[in-house]
């Protein structure tokens, strides 16, 4: 076993040869390298597959032996100070290694098809391979300073990939926003690392955990300083994992290519913050105030992310806010000490969200021939609809991913989310209520995304489409805005006399000629692809979707309990995940109870599934064909018209829409307070520098010049007069100097 562990340091380095080869190829033989660019995908996938095999082998040994292996070598030695560099292999590391490598391989395969026609194909593979290397190095780090080194590399790669299409001003602005926002968290992380080094004298995890065990009994360390340093460490995780209030970079990060969006949201960037907290949980567990703060931030984030996803029209941004909300669940679980549930949800969410993002990329590819390559159009769900007829494989995989994230059994996210909900209710009813309500919201907005994209009819053909926003459905709101002039009401999402309906995306009453017009764009699947209608993507992009679908269907079973032998009070709880995550310290609430109550599990499951089904039902009523049926009933329409509360409900809808579509006004607040405030401060500084500092300097010089010009005419041009005045000046100077 130890023989295998000794070569674990190879795992983060395996993708590097391809990166270096592509770099040297572009420098030495650029023409040949670019002509053979598609070949470079194979070694990238191959080397990461080898890393995956190593990771699986290490994980099997962890499950069988539950041992921890650490190897260190000195990097810097100076008197009593020693900075070590090495790697740590434990259950947490092995889980993250498998997660990163499996998702990374599928994203690389998908990227070969998605980026095949892009001029930056090689550059993209260099960035994404280095991204994988950085994340693998981060999860195998053995101390805080090593984590910080790879932490910054992960941030750099995300900056390069978010701004991959840097010629687009929006993408350039998005990567800068992500970089600046994460600098806030990274600065806090660095201060926290330095603070704990000053307190403990070590950066190694094992030393920190040993000292943390003695904090409460000895009470020899300033608790305020320790809490402050722990808060600074947590600030780094807040920025990286897009937690409130440093979440604003995540939706804008969707300006990058879709494969990198999948990798960031599933296994790399946002997972780094959760990993850091999980790694340092034995340290945080000794600070109850920090644990309460972590759970509070997670609760706010999971609810805020769900509300902001309600009215988004961009398919990728809707999924981004979904990620933000699910990361809030993980943060809540860590804050209440539910270590296993947090990591379980990290695993299940990673595969489901990777499936959804890659599926959205397939949808975007199918829409681009119709609406163009601008993300404002190709990612706009207002222009989609009815895609189930044209891309059935993508539709099937996307549906399963949606149901998984909604918490429908027996899909992956059901098991992990149900565990978090149960533990949150046990910890605090306040957290339990918000987490449960958000679970219903999750089902609603996720099924909304599915229905807008695949349900109904293809809306882009309902008018004479053009590239201008004013003449397209781009400006049509799904939440009750008025219909722009020039748009035929027969072709608008469900309408009333005053405007577009709050939720529905279907036509309440479709005329016969309209159906014929829709039918003219429909052909049977399998016919020759044309640009008149969307079509399925190639096998290179479909294969990862099918593999991720298998993970979504079956990965949740690693957390299902099975009988480990009869006990006096019940049945002993044992899962593959719990055996895998056998911790050296029992710092989770759920692990302290070794018994599982089947009745309690069924009760909790029924409650969570009921919430999910209710959210799906509401979404179907507002977005599905059922809404059109009810809209056409004169009795219900007349009842709604006579209802005195209708105006109040409409106002509530508009307020919810404004809150969600404007991102909770948080971005506007940051722009006005920080961006405009800093710009105003720089303008004031510039005025002070040029007007005051430079003014004084230039004024002294100008005054000296003017005085000199006046004095030179006093002597009348005679040398004797100049000598006389010179002696007078010297005499006055000596008088004051000597006195």
Curated annotation (Swiss-Prot):
Example of a GO MF term: quinone binding
A Pfam family the protein falls into: Proton_antipo_C
GO cellular component: chloroplast thylakoid membrane
Keywords tagged on the record: Chloroplast, Membrane, NAD, NADP, Plastid, Plastoquinone, Quinone, Thylakoid, Translocase, Transmembrane, Transmembrane helix, Transport
EC identifiers of the protein: 7.1.1.-
Catalytic activity: a plastoquinone + NADH + (n+1) H(+)(in) = a plastoquinol + NAD(+) + n H(+)(out); a plastoquinone + NADPH + (n+1) H(+)(in) = a plastoquinol + NADP(+) + n H(+)(out)
UniProt enzyme class: translocase
Main location, first listed in the record: plastid
Annotated localization: Plastid, Chloroplast thylakoid membrane
Membrane topology: Multi-pass membrane protein
UniProt-listed InterPro entries: NADH_UbQ_OxRdtase_chlpt_su5_C (IPR002128), NADHpl_OxRdtase_5_subgr (IPR018393), ND/Mrp_TM (IPR001750), NU5C-like (IPR003945), Proton_antipo_N (IPR001516)
Protein's UniProt keywords contain Thylakoid: yes
Gene Ontology biological-process annotations: ATP synthesis coupled electron transport; electron transport coupled proton transport
Highest taxon above the source species: Eukaryota
Residues passing through the membrane, by range: 9-29, 39-59, 89-109, 125-145, 147-167, 185-205, 219-239, 258-278, 280-300, 327-347, 354-374, 396-416, 425-445, 542-562, 610-630, 719-739
NCBIfam families assigned to the protein according to its UniProt record, in alphabetical order: NDH_I_L, PRK06590.1
Function, in words: NDH shuttles electrons from NAD(P)H:plastoquinone, via FMN and iron-sulfur (Fe-S) centers, to quinones in the photosynthetic chain and possibly in a chloroplast respiratory chain. The immediate electron acceptor for the enzyme in this species is believed to be plastoquinone. Couples the redox reaction to proton translocation, and thus conserves the redox energy in a proton gradient.
Family: Belongs to the complex I subunit 5 family.
Subunit text: NDH is composed of at least 16 different subunits, 5 of which are encoded in the nucleus.
Name of protein: NAD(P)H-quinone oxidoreductase subunit 5, chloroplastic
Organism: Hordeum vulgare (Barley)
Recorded name of the encoding gene: ndhF
């Amino acid at each position: 076993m130890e023989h295998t562990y000794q070569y674990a340091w190879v795992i983060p380095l395996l993708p590097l040869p391809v990166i270096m080869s592509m770099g040297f190829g572009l420098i030495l033989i650029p023409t040949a390298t670019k002509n053979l660019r598609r070949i470079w995908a194979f070694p990238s996938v191959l080397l990461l597959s080898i890393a995956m095999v190593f990771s699986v082998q290490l994980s099997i040994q962890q499950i069988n032996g539950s041992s921890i292996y650490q190897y260190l070598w000195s990097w810097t030695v100076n008197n009593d100070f020693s900075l070590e560099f090495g790697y740590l292999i434990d259950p947490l590391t092995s889980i993250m290694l498998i997660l990163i490598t499996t998702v990374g391989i599928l994203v690389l395969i998908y990227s070969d098809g998605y980026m095949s026609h892009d001029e930056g194909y090689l550059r993209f593979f260099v960035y994404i391979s280095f991204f994988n290397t950085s994340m693998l190095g981060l999860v195998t780090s053995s101390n805080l300073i090593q984590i910080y080194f790879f932490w910054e590399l992960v941030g750099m790669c995300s900056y390069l990939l978010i701004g991959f299409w840097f010629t687009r001003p929006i993408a350039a602005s998005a990567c800068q926003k992500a970089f600046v926002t994460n600098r806030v968290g990274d600065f806090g992380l660095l201060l926290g690392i330095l603070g704990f080094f000053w307190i403990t004298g070590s950066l190694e995890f094992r030393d920190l955990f040993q000292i943390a065990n003695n904090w409460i009994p000895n009470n020899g360390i300033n608790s305020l300083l320790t809490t402050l340093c722990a808060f600074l460490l947590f600030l780094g995780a807040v920025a990286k994992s897009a937690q409130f209030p440093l979440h604003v970079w995540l939706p804008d990060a969707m300006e990058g290519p879709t494969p990198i969006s999948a990798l960031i949201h599933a296994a790399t960037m946002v997972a780094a913050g959760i990993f850091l907290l999980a790694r340092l949980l034995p340290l945080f567990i000794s600070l109850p105030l920090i644990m309460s703060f972590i759970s509070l931030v997670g609760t706010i984030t999971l609810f805020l992310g769900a509300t902001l996803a309600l009215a988004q029209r961009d398919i990728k941004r809707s999924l981004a806010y979904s990620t933000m909300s699910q990361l809030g669940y993980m943060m809540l679980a860590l804050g209440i000490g539910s270590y296993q549930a947090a990591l379980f949800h990290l695993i299940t969410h990673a595969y489901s969200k990777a499936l959804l993002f890659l599926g959205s990329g397939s949808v975007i590819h199918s829409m681009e021939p119709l609406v163009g390559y601008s993300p404002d159009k190709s990612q706009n769900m207002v222009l989609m609809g009815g895609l189930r007829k044209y891309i059935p494989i993508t539709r099937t995989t996307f549906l399963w991913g949606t149901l998984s994230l909604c918490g429908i059994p027996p899909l992956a996210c059901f098991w992990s989310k149900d565990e978090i909900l149960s533990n949150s209710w046990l910890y605090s009813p306040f957290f339990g209520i918000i987490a449960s309500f958000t679970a219903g919201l999750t089902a609603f907005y996720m099924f909304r995304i599915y229905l807008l994209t695949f349900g109904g009819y293809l809306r882009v053909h309902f008018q004479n489409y053009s590239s201008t926003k004013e003449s397209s459905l781009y400006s049509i709101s799904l939440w009750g805005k008025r219909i722009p002039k020039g748009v035929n009401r027969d072709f608008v999402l469900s309408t009333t006399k005053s405007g577009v309906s709050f939720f529905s995306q279907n036509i309440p009453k479709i005329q016969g000629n309209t159906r014929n017009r829709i039918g003219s764009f429909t052909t049977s699947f399998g016919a020759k692809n044309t640009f008149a209608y969307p079509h399925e993507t190639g096998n290179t992009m479909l294969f990862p979707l099918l593999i991720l679908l298998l993970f979504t269907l079956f990965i949740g079973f690693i957390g299902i309990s099975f009988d480990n032998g009869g006990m006096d009070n019940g049945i002993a709880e044992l899962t593959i995940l719990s055996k895998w995550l056998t911790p050296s310290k029992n710092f989770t609430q759920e692990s302290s109870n070794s018994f599982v109550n089947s009745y309690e599990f069924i009760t909790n499951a029924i409650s969570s599934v009921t919430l999910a089904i209710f959210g799906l039902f509401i979404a179907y009523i507002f977005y599905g064909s059922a809404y059109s049926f009810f809209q056409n009933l004169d009795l219900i329409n007349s009842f709604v018209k006579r209802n005195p509360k209708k105006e109040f409900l409409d106002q509530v809808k508009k307020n919810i829409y404004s809150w969600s579509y404007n991102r909770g006004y948080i971005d506007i607040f940051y722009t006005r307070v920080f961006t405009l405030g800093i710009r105003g401060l720089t303008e004031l500084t510039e005025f002070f520098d040029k007007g005051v500092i430079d003014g004084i300097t230039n004024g002294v010089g100008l005054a000296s010049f003017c005085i000199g010009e006046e004095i030179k005419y006093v002597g009348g041009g005679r040398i004797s007069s100049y000598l006389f005045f010179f002696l007078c000046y010297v005499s006055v100077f000596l008088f004051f100097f000597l006195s």
